[in-house]
Curated annotation (Swiss-Prot):
Molecular function (Gene Ontology), one example: receptor tyrosine kinase binding
Listed name of the protein: Hyaluronidase-2
InterPro entries: Aldolase_TIM, Glycoside_hydrolase_SF, Hyaluronidase
UniProt gene name: Hyal2
Catalysis: reaction(s): Random hydrolysis of (1->4)-linkages between N-acetyl-beta-D-glucosamine and D-glucuronate residues in hyaluronate
C-alpha cells in the first residue's frame, strides 16, 4: 500500500507547491469569452435617428447606455437616484434621505433594492456588469475633503447635539466612528442584497479602488504617478468592501493637462496596478476581475484621445492584466449633428482600429501562451511592452457584409512574435486552471488524484481480502 500511494502523495505535493507559487486565479471572462473586452457605454443611440449619423459599434464586445429608460443591458449603472434611499446632500446643501449615512434608514432602504434591480436587470441570465455609482461621500472619513467635507461637518454636529459637554477631539472621534460604521453598513448590506437578487452579475462600486494620484497639477516635474502610501493603506482599510465585491471598477479618465505626455501613462498605470493589487490581495478564493472605466475624450471637453493616450489607457490596462475597459460618456456626445459626425470620424479612423488591434493581440496571447485558459500580464509592470499586433505579421481588413466583424486581423504570429510574448508576458489563469501556461485542469487533476487514491485503497483492500480468504481456507 505504501509503495502504491507514495508517487500519488508526491505528485499531490508537487502540484500543491506549484499551484501555490502562481498568481491567485481570476474569474473567467464573461460576454464573448475574450480575455480583454472593450465596452461602449455612451448614450449615442440618438445619432442615427435624430441627426442621420449612424455609428458602427460592431467592434465593441458590449454596447450599452447609462441613460434612464434602458433595461436588460449587459452593463447596468445604478446612480444614487436609481437604487434605494441613498443618504446624501444635494447641490443646494439640503439633506436627502438623512444626509449622512448614520442618519439614513437601512430598514427603509433595503426593501426598495429588489424592485430597482429587477426593473433594470429583468432576467437572471445572461451575466453582466452591475456598477453602483455612489460618489457623494466616501466610506473612509479622511477622504471626505473639499465639497465632501459637509459629511464630516454634519457628523460632528450630530454628535455635538447629543453631547454638548464633550470636548471637540472626543466629538470628532465619535463622529468618525459613527460615520464610517454607518457607511460600511450601507455599502455592505446594499452589495449583499443586490447580489442575492442577481447573483450571476458582477457587482462593484464605480471608482473603487481609487489611488488619488492627481498631484501632477502641483508637481509636474517630479510627478511619478505612484499612489501615495497613505492611500494604499486606506484602501487596505476597505478590505471589508473588496471581500464582498465581485468586480472592481477603477477610473482612468484623463485630464487634457496629461495629453501626449509620459505622465498620462504613469497616471493610468499606477491606478490600474492598485486595483489589481486590491483584486488579488483582498478576495479569498480568487482575484477579482478589474474593468477600467475610461472616456473617448479628455475630461470636461470633447477633444478625442490621441493615439499615444489610447495606448496609455487601453493598451496599458490590457498589458497589466485587466479584464477590460468600459468607455463611458454622457448625452453631450450625441447632442448635435457635428458631435455625432466628429465621433463617427474618430471611431472609424482611430478608436476602432486600435481596440481591434489590442483585443485580438490579447486573444492571440491567451491562445498561444495560456492555452486559452488565462490572460497575459506583463512580467514587469513598469516595462514599455504592450499587447499589439505586429504590423509585419498582421493587417486589419474590413468586413465584407454587415454580419461580419467591422475589422478583423489577417495574418499569423511569427516566431519573433511568439518569442516576444513569452519573454515579456506571463499567464494569469482563470479559476480551475493552473500551471505556467494554464495547462493544468485543477478539477480534473483533483479527480484523477482522488480516483488513483481510491484505486490504490481498493487494490489494498482486495489484497487483504484475498489474504484473509487464503488463511481461512
Amino acid at each position: 500500500m505504501r509503495a502504491g500511494l507514495g508517487p500519488i502523495i508526491t505528485l499531490a505535493l508537487v502540484l500543491e507547491v506549484a499551484w501555490a507559487s502562481e498568481l491567485k486565479p481570476t474569474a473567467p471572462p464573461i460576454f464573448t469569452g475574450r480575455p480583454f473586452v472593450v465596452a461602449w457605454n455612451v448614450p449615442t443611440q440618438e445619432c442615427a435617428p435624430r441627426h442621420k449619423v449612424p455609428l458602427d459599434l460592431r467592434a465593441f464586445d458590449v454596447e450599452a447606455t447609462p441613460n434612464e429608460g434602458f433595461f436588460n443591458q449587459n452593463i447596468t449603472t445604478f446612480y444614487y437616484d436609481r437604487l434605494g434611499l441613498y443618504p446624501r446632500f444635494d447641490a443646494a446643501g439640503m439633506s436627502v434621505h438623512g444626509g449622512v449615512p448614520q442618519n439614513g434608514s437601512l430598514c427603509a432602504h433595503l426593501p426598495m433594492l429588489k424592485e430597482a434591480v429587477e426593473r433594470y436587470i429583468q432576467t437572471q441570465e445572461p451575466a453582466g456588469l452591475a456598477v453602483i455609482d455612489w460618489e457623494e461621500w466616501r466610506p473612509v472619513w479622511v477622504r471626505n475633503w473639499q465639497e465632501k467635507d459637509v459629511y464630516r461637518q454634519s457628523s460632528r454636529q450630530l454628535v455635538a447635539s447629543r453631547h454638548p459637554d464633550w470636548p471637540s477631539d472626543r466629538i470628532v472621534k465619535q463622529a468618525q466612528y459613527e460615520f464610517e460604521f454607518a457607511a460600511r453598513q450601507f455599502m455592505l448590506n446594499t452589495l449583499r442584497y443586490v447580489k442575492a437578487v442577481r447573483p450571476q452579475h458582477l457587482w462593484g462600486f464605480y471608482l473603487f479602488p481609487d489611488c488619488y494620484n492627481h498631484d501632477y497639477v502641483q508637481n509636474w516635474d517630479s510627478y511619478t504617478g505612484r499612489c501615495p502610501d497613505v492611500e494604499v493603506a486606506q484602501n487596505d482599510q476597505l478590505a471589508w468592501l473588496w471581500a464582498e465585491n465581485t468586480a472592481l471598477f477603477p477610473s482612468v479618465y484623463l485630464d487634457k493637462t496629461l495629453a501626449s505626455s509620459k505622465h498620462s501613462r504613469n497616471f493610468v498605470s499606477f491606478r490600474v496596478q492598485e486595483a489589481l493589487r486590491v483584486a488579488h490581495t483582498h478576495h479569498a478564493n480568487h482575484a477579482l476581475p478589474v474593468y477600467v472605466f475610461t472616456r473617448p475624450t479628455y475630461t470636461r471637453r470633447l477633444t478625442e484621445l490621441n493615439q499615444m493616450d489610447l495606448i496609455s489607457t487601453i493598451g496599458e490596462s490590457a498589458a497589466l492584466g485587466s479584464a477590460g475597459v468600459i468607455f463611458w460618456g454622457d448625452s453631450v456626445y450625441a447632442s448635435s449633428m457635428e458631435n455625432c459626425q466628429n465621433l463617427k470620424k474618430y471611431l472609424t479612423q482611430t478608436l476602432v482600429p486600435y481596440i481591434v488591434n489590442v483585443s485580438w493581440a490579447t486573444q492571440y496571447c491567451s491562445w498561444t501562451q495560456c492555452h486559452g485558459h488565462g490572460r497575459c500580464v506583463r512580467r514587469n509592470p513598469s516595462a514599455s511592452t504592450f499587447l499589439h499586433l505586429s504590423p509585419s505579421s498582421f493587417r486589419l481588413v474590413p468586413g465584407r457584409t454587415p454580419s461580419e466583424p467591422q475589422l478583423r486581423p489577417e495574418g499569423e504570429l511569427s516566431e519573433d512574435d511568439l518569442s516576444y510574448l513569452q519573454m515579456h508576458f506571463r499567464c494569469h489563469c482563470y479559476l480551475g486552471w493552473g500551471g505556467e501556461q494554464c495547462q493544468w485542469n485543477h478539477k480534473r487533476a483533483a479527480g484523477d488524484a482522488s480516483r488513483a487514491w481510491a484505486g490504490a485503497h481498493l487494490a489494498s483492500l482486495l489484497g487483504l481480502v484475498a489474504m484473509t480468504l487464503t488463511w481461512t481456507l
